[in-house]
A protein has these predicted regions:
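Short Gly/aromatic-enriched secondary-structure transition segments
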Residues: 10-11, 124-127, 132-139
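Domain-core and long-helix interface of multi-subunit machines
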Residues: 106, 147-148
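Residues that define the transmembrane beta-barrel architecture of outer-membrane proteins
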Residues: 102-106, 178
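Outer-membrane beta-barrel pore domains and translocons
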Residues: 1-2, 113, 124-126
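Repeated loop/turn-to-beta-strand initiation elements of outer-membrane beta-barrel proteins
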Residues: 116-120
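Conserved small-residue
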Residues: 1-98, 138-141, 149-177
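Outer-membrane beta-barrel architecture
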Residues: 109-111
Length: 178
């Protein structure tokens, strides 16, 4: 059976979004965020390094470079990626990108007995759950750490079809977005 819960009544007239903020019509465990479109490419920039018209930049992100993540722009503002008013009525460019509620729980139990020896096993799991990774699994290179082999497929000028965005020093640039 599908484990989902929806809030049918809650006093939040402003429809604010956020962690532990509830609203009518919300499915428990909603994950709001930006939807990846692609990486910025060198073609998105003018010769002086500024973005060409119509290429959006995340609000407050500072300067972006080729290889940074470009998010989809869903609202009428074509120059900025932003969180709107932070409400369900005006989420800006954020969308529901997942749900952290474990769904489709299952379990299997088996046992066998032979000449006084008993063996039993119990397996259980979840068939669907989205996970918002914000720890060392997501950011394994914190501090002076080294890269895992799996993370070496990052964007460079010679590897523009990479899986991961460009790497850069931990100087606080784009930390809210990339």
């Amino acid at each position: 059976y599908d484990s989902q819960s929806e809030i049918t009544k809650y006093n939040n007239e402003t429809n604010l979004l956020g962690d532990k903020i509830y609203r009518k019509g919300m499915k428990m465990g909603e994950i709001w965020g930006y939807v990846t479109d692609r990486f910025y490419t060198e073609d998105d920039f003018n010769a002086d390094g500024t973005l060409k018209p119509g290429i959006p930049i995340p609000k407050g992100a500072g300067k972006v470079f080729p290889g940074d993540v470009l998010y989809k722009n869903f609202d009428d503002d074509t120059e900025t990626i932003w969180s709107g008013e932070g409400t369900a009525d005006n989420p800006g460019d954020q969308r529901i990108i997942g749900n952290s509620t474990p769904r489709f729980h299952y379990g299997i139990t088996a046992g066998i007995s032979w000449k006084g020896l008993d063996l039993s096993i119990f397996l259980r799991g979840v068939g669907k759950r989205d996970y918002w990774r914000t720890d060392q699994i997501a950011w394994p290179t914190g501090g002076w750490g080294s890269l895992f082999k799996e993370t070496l497929n990052f964007w460079t000028p010679t590897n523009t079809n990479a899986y991961y965005p460009r790497v850069y020093s931990n100087d606080g640039v784009n930390t809210s977005y990339n």
